[in-house]
A protein has these predicted regions:
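Extracellular/luminal segments of secreted precursors and ectodomains of membrane proteins
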Residues: 3-156
């Protein structure tokens, strides 16, 4: 857990959690839309977003590297991840902020396709421009990415 006095680490964790939740929401909306033949009603989109956020706490975790917890969120089963109460809270709160009703239309727009471009656009729009969770558009785009992860891990 970040130290109580480490505001920078908390800010990065919130940004990384937002990006991971945003990626999961875009992916799940695109998959549900594809399953339904390209059409997704608002009610179905809302149910999909609620289900994604309900799973966020269980599926998202902080990656482990050399036996240490990093600031990088992942949901890949092939990646060693740390989980726990505060990690779950970061993931769930990030997802809940994105589906609070204010950003649902944007998520439905980004959720029309599941590719890196849609995810990056959604991160920038939602995690930076709309919520201010990430301090810059570049921070939102770089969140949880390998190059940024390596740089952060060296700094720890």
């Amino acid at each position: 857990m970040p130290r109580d006095d480490d505001d920078d680490a908390r800010r990065r964790l919130r940004c990384n959690a937002c990006a991971a939740a945003c990626d999961a929401l875009v992916r799940d909306l695109a998959r549900e839309r594809a399953r339904r033949g390209g059409t997704l009603t608002r009610a179905l989109a809302d149910a999909t977003m609620e289900a994604t956020c309900a799973r966020a706490g269980e599926e998202l975790g902080l990656t482990m590297r050399d036996g240490r917890v990093t600031e990088t969120f992942a949901e890949d089963d092939g990646t060693a991840r740390a989980r726990g109460r505060w990690i779950t809270v970061y993931a769930r709160e990030a997802c809940a902020r994105l589906i609070d009703g204010e950003h649902d239309d944007a998520l439905m727009t980004f959720g029309k396709r599941d590719d890196g471009g849609a995810r990056m656009e959604a991160r920038e729009a939602l995690c930076h421009a709309r919520t201010g969770t990430c301090e810059s558009a570049s921070a939102a785009r770089a969140a949880n990415e390998l190059e940024a992860r390596d740089r952060r891990d060296r700094e720890l």
